[in-house]
Amino acid sequence: MKKIKLIAALLSVLFLTGCVDQSGNQSADNDTKEKRIVATSVATCEILDKLEVEGVVGVPKTDSYSIPKRYENAESVGSPMAPDMEIIKSLKPDIVLSPNSLEGELKSQYENIGVESYFLDLKSTEGMYESILALGKILGKEEEAEKLHQEFEDFKNDFAQKHNEQEAPTVLILMGLPGSYVVATESSYVGSLVKLAGGVNVYGDGDGQDFLNINPEDMVEKAPDIILRTSHALPEQVKKMFAEEFATNDIWKHFEAVQNARVYDLDNEKFGMSANFQYEEALKELETFLYQEGTN
């Protein structure tokens, strides 16, 4: 695999490569010249918008989420899962930004079209903010990045103090897909939010796997206090699927969480696949589910 040689101005960001992985075969300078940027996910666009970056020339095609108004005139480069390499190449970007969950699929493709790429850690809120710090250095937005990071640290510390004396509830998280579902672990974004809120995932970090295929018979043995349900896409369709599954599959009647009406459906815009800036609202919503008795 070809190793990138970045010029000296970028060497200061190498300590953050755990958060932003770098690839490609072009060098990029960190001067005052506005870089041409392609962002292949909505979450990445939102980060750039928060950093007040203007040079975005390519954005993902999406029917479910809104692209920041700042980038409404940027070229569509196709779906986040499979961006169009020919369109990206035609835009002559200095940098392409994508989530690191897709690095295995996209890294070699970016190399093949000769563009430099950066992969952001969007698997947790903490990872997102470390990536923001790295991008601040790369894009000359260090002040904005530091401000955002400090705001997150202040919120996180204040939030952690609210329930540190309370018993942590155990939680089962189901991530729905049309026609099926998987278990989300602490390694997933929604799982990281539950952990940040003080919940204990009954499947832990899944040995580093974001999602696990588990049958309900095994889940019931974990005896979760709470069941949370969210979706990867098509939220209304998935919500109906979950309702039918829980109504027709007798195994769910044996869960104390079901018996105690502690099953909650989450908004997939806040509790989706990638970290985003709705984490404050998400944590406050989780707070009501984790620490107060409730009903569906």
Indicate where each model-derived feature is located.
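C-terminal motif of bacterial Sec signal peptides marking the signal peptidase cleavage site
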Residues: 15-18
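Structured C-terminal subdomain patch of bacterial secreted/periplasmic proteins
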Residues: 35-36, 129-132, 137-138, 146, ...
